[in-house]
A protein has these predicted regions:
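Generic signature of intrinsically disordered, low-complexity, basic-rich segments
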Residues: 10, 34-36, 40-42, 50, ...
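Sec-dependent bacterial lipoprotein signal peptides
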Residues: 1-20
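Intrinsically disordered, low-complexity peptide-like regions
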Residues: 3-4, 8, 35, 43, ...
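Mature extracytoplasmic or organellar-lumen-exposed domains after removal of signal/transit peptides
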Residues: 62-436
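Bacterial Sec-dependent N-terminal signal peptides
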Residues: 17-73, 435-436
């Protein structure tokens, strides 16, 4: 194996990290940097930058391990991948969201599903009832842990509003200030909205993409604080397994992060080549973003980063692992940003029609509402913070869903406020309003 290198340039200072390599991976660094130092690479070629200048750096990075084509990892003939707990929580969350569309559901039932206790008959699936897992204690408890209580209150408030306001008006036609049903033009889908035009089930569904899925993955399981906890680094170096298991702690943590996204995939080993799932959370919208020509390749890129990071964990290549985690954070966060802007733009375009289809507008804006809420759980790997803080997100929501001063949410939102919010989101995530 040859001695090869990574080149990283931060704030104009170049540093070299040498790795043993057996596989070549091309990485394009597109950011512009100001170079003020002389950088010399001496192996077979020499690159010298001697002037202060703005340059775009493109380099070939060689890594010291193979990246498998699928998410299949074994040890002594046994799989080392396990994320059944994540699949369980996704199933619980999905059934809870479904219950929000059944007007016979009580608030006690919804809250019990959210805060499931082992053995309670909260779900239609006996295995879920027998489980000690629950959704509530994994909601908003990582990157936004200081806001965890407020986040759970938000979710429970939407559930309560659905039961108290929407269910009693299930057969009433909605109007400004009054909950009820509203049908899309041409005999399309019937939507059930609250007094301000919001579909509470969509708010809960899309908010959980951030508060449960993204938060657990990006701000929890794939962070150095989690992966390196205890003696994990030393244990991974010698591949010390968890008692009675085929995997190490670090491998399992990485897989648990993977499970929150791919836990309901039809083929969890190869969900890109063999797409399909009954997921209603992150994985579903990865597929939707990937189908947009402006973001084609997103699904493959994200899954490859998961495979690369997992392979790096096996080899105890922790810098490569963290680089893959950063790639995952950027790509998964982008999915949330793209869909938030997309739905706000769709609502704005709908309102601009000569005869707006308000049911369609409300549906788009309800989905957008939940995705905007989820932005507080994203992670910008360059800053180590979300792309928008909770305070910034709540301020944005107050503009796209105004409910003060007698205003009635989506009934009164303006096209300009929707376009401004969509543009602000697009700019932060590095795309344009037109791309959305």
């Amino acid at each position: 194996m040859n001695l090869l290198k990574y080149i990283f340039i931060y704030g104009g200072i170049a540093s070299l990290i040498f790795l043993l390599s057996c596989e070549e991976e091309t990485v394009t660094v597109t950011e512009e940097v100001i170079v003020t130092d002389t950088v010399t690479i001496t192996e077979t070629d020499t690159l010298t930058i001697t002037e202060t200048d703005t340059v775009t750096v493109t380099d070939t990075v060689l890594i010291g391990f193979a990246i498998p084509a699928t998410y299949l990892f074994t040890r002594d003939g046994d799989t080392t991948v396990s994320y059944s707990g994540q699949t369980t929580r996704l199933k619980m969350a999905k059934e809870m969201v479904s219950a929000l569309k059944d007007e016979t559901t009580t608030i006690a039932k919804l809250l019990a599903m959210f805060d499931h206790q082992e053995g309670a008959s909260d779900f239609s699936d006996a295995d879920l009832n027998a489980s000690s897992k629950q959704v509530k204690n994994k909601t908003g408890n990582n990157g936004t842990a200081t806001n965890a209580a407020a986040i759970r209150v938000d979710l429970e408030a939407w559930m309560t509003n659905q039961v108290d306001s929407v269910f009693p008006a299930w057969t009433d036609e909605a109007s400004k200030g009054l909950a009820g049903y509203i049908q899309e033009a041409g005999g399309g889908s019937t939507r059930y909205v609250n007094q301000n035009g919001l579909e509470n089930n969509q708010a809960v569904n899309k908010a959980l993409i951030g508060a449960l899925v993204a938060d657990q993955v990006l701000n929890g399981y794939l962070t150095p604080a989690k992966l390196n906890s205890g003696t994990n680094e030393a244990d991974q170096a010698v591949q010390t397994k968890v008692d009675g298991k085929s995997y190490t702690n670090m491998e399992h943590y990485w897989d648990e992060g993977y499970g929150y996204i791919y836990g309901l995939a039809t083929d969890g080993i190869d969900p890109v080549t063999t797409p399909g799932s009954n997921d209603i959370f992150m994985l579903k919208y990865i597929g939707k973003v990937d189908s947009d020509p402006d973001f084609s390749g997103t699904a493959g890129e994200l899954h490859r980063a998961f495979r690369e990071g997992r392979a790096a964990v096996v080899e105890a290549e922790f810098e490569a692992r963290d680089a893959a985690a950063h790639h995952i954070a950027k790509t998964a966060s982008l999915v949330i940003g793209v869909r938030a802007a997309h739905y706000l733009k769709a609502g704005q375009i709908g309102l601009a029609a000569a005869s707006p289809d308000m049911a369609g507008v409300f549906h788009d804006l309800s989905e957008g509402f939940g995705f905007v809420y989820s932005i507080q759980f994203t992670l910008n790997p360059e800053t180590g913070a979300p792309y928008f803080s909770r305070e910034e997100v709540m301020e944005m929501l107050s503009k796209i869903y105004p409910t003060t001063g007698g205003m009635r949410g989506f009934w009164d939102v303006t096209q300009s406020d929707l376009q401004e919010a969509a543009t602000t989101i697009a700019t932060a995530f590095g795309f344009t309003y037109e791309n959305a």
